């Protein structure tokens, strides 16, 4: 009767040495270089075994924000998303499908405008990511401001650490 049918990756790996019970994995990336590269490695491993991947990148500080430990300004989210894009294209899912990655960012993030340009066909290719899917979390407050032609303020997450959890 097909009352339940698992996702394609689950079916693909059933009965193999690498079975998966989930076809998609969602993670949150923190504002820490070691964690960023751990997430890139995790994405590659999950993709290798047919998992689709989604990453929330909202916690990364915005472009120009100070990285106090080395006293330099951050280059923001976009260069890391370029790496995510490249990992996605290099790893094919079990040799059968290309990698699939979605990246998420809040509408108040300082880098949201550059983020929205990631998939454009024009501009600096070092700031483009054509092979990942972008998603933007849009709160009701944003839409209310749009309706009223109101102001919207952008922040770097290191300046408002609790905003993402509201």
Where in this protein do the model-derived segments appear?
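Extended catalytic cores of very large enzyme megasubunits
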Residues: 1-166
């Amino acid at each position: 009767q097909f009352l339940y049918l698992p996702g394609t990756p689950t079916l693909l790996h059933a009965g193999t040495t690498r079975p998966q019970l989930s076809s998609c994995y969602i993670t949150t990336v923190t504002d820490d270089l070691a964690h960023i590269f751990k997430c890139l490695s995790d994405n590659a491993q999950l993709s290798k075994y047919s998992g689709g991947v989604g990453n929330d990148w909202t916690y990364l500080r915005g472009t120009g924000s100070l990285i106090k430990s080395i006293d330099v300004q951050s280059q923001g989210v976009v260069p890391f998303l370029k790496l995510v894009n490249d990992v996605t294209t290099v790893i094919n899912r079990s040799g059968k499908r290309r990698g699939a990655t979605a990246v998420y960012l809040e509408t108040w993030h300082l880098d949201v405008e550059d983020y929205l340009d990631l998939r454009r066909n024009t501009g600096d290719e070092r700031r483009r990511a054509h092979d990942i899917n972008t998603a933007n979390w849009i709160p009701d407050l944003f839409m209310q401001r749009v309706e009223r032609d109101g102001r919207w303020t952008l922040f770097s997450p290191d300046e408002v650490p609790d905003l993402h959890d509201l």
